[in-house]
A protein has these predicted regions:
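A short C-terminal helix-loop "cap" of Rossmann-like NAD(P)-dependent dehydrogenase/epimerase domains
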Residues: 7-10, 56-67, 123, 148, ...
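A general structural signal marking secondary-structure boundaries and capping sites
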Residues: 48, 62-63, 93, 121-124, ...
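Catalytic helix-loop patch of NAD(P)-dependent Rossmann-fold dehydrogenases
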Residues: 1-43, 64-68
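Amphipathic terminal alpha-helices
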Residues: 171-179, 183, 187-205
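Mid/C-terminal beta-alpha module of Rossmann-like enzyme folds, strongest
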Residues: 88-155, 189, 193-196
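Conserved C-terminal active-site "lid" loop/helix of NAD(P)H-dependent oxidoreductases
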Residues: 79, 115, 141-181
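Substrate-positioning beta->alpha
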Residues: 19, 23-24, 49-54, 68-90, ...
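Residue-level signal for the nucleotide or nucleotide-sugar donor/cofactor binding architecture
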Residues: 15, 74-80, 108, 171, ...
Length: 205
């Protein structure tokens, strides 16, 4: 099992998005006497979130798509737990100028989320497709280039490849529990249940 990432580890972002976040953190640290708290949530899901909705819609259409053959270790946080962490960071004493990872405290394999989605959607039959990373990389590169030439934006680009190719998303939330008083309230199963119920109630599915 891969080691947990901690807030004290040296950051090595592999996407433009991650690099922009790191630069923002570095800038904040250069401002003297500025009171700030940095939260680093892992995979955020819940009502209105669209990236994981795409997975739910795909499963409702009988396709479960995954990439890479090496097992992933993934972490998630339900949006309500993230809000809890944000609110606690506003009032917790002595946490200024600190960074915290936020998750539900558990580590999951790459099928955990899709299996829970499938259960909440009534266990539809599935065609499971697992593409090799080289194929995903080629698709993301070609699609990103075409959209860039056409002046369009796309989420299927080299950044997305690096996100999906990452195998270790484990993180240490002990400091958030100890210093913020953060306590995850939602298991992945509970969060997925609420999320799918919201999708259905608002006719997303």
């Amino acid at each position: 099992r891969a080691p947990e990432n901690t807030a004290d580890d040296t950051s090595h972002p592999n996407t433009a998005y991650g690099e922009s976040k790191l630069q923002a953190e570095q800038y904040l640290r250069t401002v003297p006497d500025l009171h700030y708290v940095i939260l680093r949530p892992t995979g955020v899901y819940g009502p209105r979130e669209r990236d994981y909705f795409i997975m739910a819609r795909s499963i409702s259409r009988h396709i479960d798509f995954a990439v890479g053959y090496t097992p992933q270790e993934i972490t998630f946080v339900y949006v309500r737990d993230l809000v809890q962490a944000i609110m606690k960071s506003l009032t917790a004493p002595g946490v200024e100028r600190h960074a915290f990872f936020i998750s539900d405290g558990q580590t999951y394999n790459s099928r955990a989320f899709s299996d829970l989605l499938r259960a909440e959607l009534g266990n539809p039959w599935l065609l499971r497709i697992c593409a090799p990373l080289w194929f995903l990389r080629a698709v993301c590169a070609v699609n990103g280039t075409i959209c860039r030439l056409l002046g369009k934006t796309t989420t299927l680009n080299t950044d997305k490849y690096h996100i999906l190719a990452q195998r270790n998303w484990r993180c240490d939330i002990t400091p958030a529990i100890r210093l913020l008083g953060y306590t995850p309230q939602y298991s992945l199963q509970q969060g997925v249940q609420e999320t799918v119920a919201w999708y259905k109630a608002h006719h997303w599915l």
